Amino acid sequence: MDPVIELNDVVAVLGQFPALAGANLQVSRGEIVLLQGPNGAGKTSILRVCAGLLPIERGSGRVLGIDLVTQRDEVRSRVGLLGHSNGLYLDLTVEQNIRFWASMVNATEDEIVRAMSLMRIDGRLSSVKTARLSAGQRRRCALASLIVRRAEIWLLDEPHAGLDAQGRDELDSVLRHAVSAGATIVLASHEMERASALATRVVTVDGGGVQ
């Protein structure tokens, strides 16, 4: 089976600083791959390269068969990245954020309602501007937005952060359901026990490379 993510000797920089130094990674469809490693090892940089947000300086990469060097815009339209900022518009309400992302893929009303239900977003919470939300509520809103986008690949940076115990359990259930529906997931997490139990494979990132 051809990999849906393939990085070959990838070098990337952030400003003047090296972010990745010859990283190699292959991910097959339907996997949940956990990136583990110390802070600054390159986990977030790998996610950003795979999302088409961090350019490759040297080496090569493909996501869903799309070249990461020459077709980054197309990659961005096919994958979903959940980072520390959550990708939310703070001046919009929760529901407006979700409906904005839903409009990008012509998601149905049923899909919108289901995504909000999965992430426990009720009528009261849906009308609140995201600037007023707690960290956990923002994360739930961002995950609902990711669900309605129908992303084929989910790239998750600390997805359990800010969630209570119930929210973490619900997130794990959502991720397993996404994989059963055809998605592939790569995540970085400090919740090692929980994330390891969720993952189908664990890879170690250190010094800007994958071991």
Language model segments and positions:
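Helix-to-loop junction immediately C-terminal to a conserved catalytic motif
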Residues: 51
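The feature captures the beta-strand-to-loop junction immediately N-terminal to the Walker
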Residues: 36-38
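Catalytic Walker B motif of ABC-type/P-loop ATPase nucleotide-binding domains
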Residues: 154-158
